[in-house]
Amino acid sequence: MASIGIGCGSYFYASRYAEYGLSAVAILGPGTVAFFGSVKIARVLHHRITQGRWTQKENSAWWKNDTNSIRWNSLIPLMVTLVTSYSFTICMTYAWGFASQAGLNQGIISSVMNLLAIFDCIVFYFAFGEKVGWIHIVGVLLMIASIVCIGFAVNASEEDDEVDEDADEEDDEIDTGGRSKALNGILAIAIGLGAPVSLTIQHYFIRKHSGVYTGQAQAFDVAPLLNIVFCFFMPQLMDQLDVTWEDIFVGGAAGSMMESGRVLISYSIAVGLAGPVTAIVNANIAYQTILGVLLASQSLDTFQVSGILLGFLGVCAISLFDNVVKKVKLTRRLSSLRS
């Protein structure tokens, strides 16, 4: 569900506003803040009506019921999640920009996010003793192969279209920003690596503090704060785009879907295996591709079809096959005990 939410939200956001760079995040802000603000108000009112109180202090991440004091430690995961969300957005935006100036396929940068599953597996193994089975490893590898296939295929086709349109134009040369292509390529990869590192740090703190401050609560509290800051980019965006109410609605819907997906990710990270979870979520690019086919009449090439099929097999390996193996092992144990 998290992968579907992020994939659908990313499609509607990227297809309309990605060309405006970092300032495009402003279009996500107003609607997303309104959505999560409304949900928070509705939850408070529901609790007031059903329990007769505005808050539930005994289960609050922000209140110590035994000492009747504020739980200041909850600020740590909140601020870490907020800062790492900003750093992820900034790293990906500038990495794509440098990749374009280096003449690189931007799918390389998108594929760097595959390292997140590997980073999570390593960090969670040493920090929490979390181990993954061979089926999970196979599933993660299939998901990585899926994203690589789709990422390279989509971006390669976009670059081919641009080359065909501009082949006869004199200004077809790449704007390197005054730097060499080699330097731009190094900057693209180096900054792009900051994105999975940022989310690995975020996932570590989500799990570490999940006993008191649940993963979904952290993400739910961060979502409006993150998008309030995005709103400050609106003047910069309005210099490039005549923003309409339709844009606000589409941006809000896209932002709400992506943030809802992140809430589900945070919950899954807190209670499940971090590496396989992030591998499945990274398959959101497959949903973007499918929406492009259904809504924009885009065609699928061999790489994209292969990527979607590999992604499906990866999900099955991580979730379905794992349950089957567990049931088989349980059946064998019961049989041995009976005998």
Regions found by a protein language model. Give the residues of each.
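Glycine-/small-residue-enriched transmembrane alpha-helix faces in small-molecule transporters
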Residues: 1-26, 37-39, 159-212, 330-339
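Loop-to-transmembrane-helix transition segments
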Residues: 1-3, 50-92, 186-195, 240-260, ...
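Hydrophobic alpha-helical transmembrane segments of multi-pass integral membrane proteins
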Residues: 3, 19-48, 76-80, 142, ...
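Hydrophobic/small/kink-forming positions within alpha-helical transmembrane segments
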Residues: 5, 9, 82, 86, ...
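Juxtamembrane C-cap of transmembrane helices in multi-pass membrane transport proteins
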Residues: 7-21, 87-104, 112, 126, ...
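Helix-helix packing/entry segments at the starts of transmembrane helices
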Residues: 26-28, 102-118, 209-225, 259-294
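C-terminal transmembrane-helix exit sites in multi-pass transporters
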Residues: 41, 116-138, 286-306
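Hydrophobic transmembrane alpha-helices of multi-pass small-molecule transport proteins
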Residues: 135-155, 165, 169-177, 303-322
